[in-house]
């Protein structure tokens, strides 16, 4: 298990460094970088499935720690996947905005009585304002989606960690009072997470209302 874990852990760090290349890549190479990162992420998910099987076969005294290490890798790669999707969403929105601006600049309007071209400054200004609003909303939605994905992944990790802690507690023979305190803390964490999600949605709604 250890060689595969070290290989996967190294791949996660390599992807983190490659994410910085996305911001500096030109239009011709950005798709190649995205595909390269996505292929590495897919390979890591495949390794994680194998690691989960191997961790369950570890000796009892090392099994819990092995599963926690695998869960941490899964949490890290889920964040990388979310970051990649958000970048792709922003890039596609920017490319669409540029195409629409180019189409508008290449279009001319004429009057019915003559071939006099109508000035387009006001139309361009109005279109630019709309595109800025749309771009701001896209960034906001992408950021909110990233936060919600992070909270969801954290909830899954905490849930798995709680179960493992309870299993360890049972093996060690901890008292019922300690067990109840652990369960109470997990219950409180759940409400904190739900409150954070609701607050995020409320902020997104208010900002969208302000922008429109």
From Swiss-Prot:
Segments traversing the membrane: 191-211
Top-level division of the source organism's lineage: Eukaryota
Xref: Pfam families: V-SNARE_C
Compartment list: Golgi apparatus, cis-Golgi network membrane; Golgi apparatus membrane; Endoplasmic reticulum membrane
SUPFAM superfamilies named in the record: SNARE fusion complex
Matching Gene3D superfamilies: t-snare proteins
Example of a GO MF term: SNARE binding
N-acetylmethionine, modified sites: 1
Topology of the protein relative to the lipid bilayer: Single-pass type IV membrane protein
Predominant location: Golgi
Any coiled-coil regions, as ranges: 61-107
Short sequence motif IxM motif: positions: 118-120
Chain ranges on the Vesicular side, renumbered to this chain: 212
Keywords from the UniProt entry: Acetylation, Coiled coil, Endoplasmic reticulum, Golgi apparatus, Membrane, Protein transport, Transmembrane, Transmembrane helix, Transport
GO-annotated biological processes: intra-Golgi vesicle-mediated transport; protein transport; vesicle fusion; vesicle-mediated transport
Cytoplasmic face residues: 1-190
GO CC annotation: endoplasmic reticulum membrane; ER to Golgi transport vesicle membrane; Golgi apparatus; Golgi membrane; late endosome membrane; SNARE complex
Matching InterPro entries: GOSR2/Membrin/Bos1, v-SNARE_N_sf
Family: Belongs to the GOSR2 family.
Matching PANTHER family: GOLGI SNAP RECEPTOR COMPLEX MEMBER 2, VESICLE TRANSPORT V-SNARE PROTEIN VTI1-RELATED
Job of this protein: Involved in transport of proteins from the cis/medial-Golgi to the trans-Golgi network.
Complexes and interactors: Part of a unique SNARE complex composed of the Golgi SNAREs GOSR1, STX5 and YKT6. Interacts with BET1.
Name this polypeptide is given: Golgi SNAP receptor complex member 2
Source organism per UniProt: Rattus norvegicus (Rat)
Gene name as annotated: Gosr2
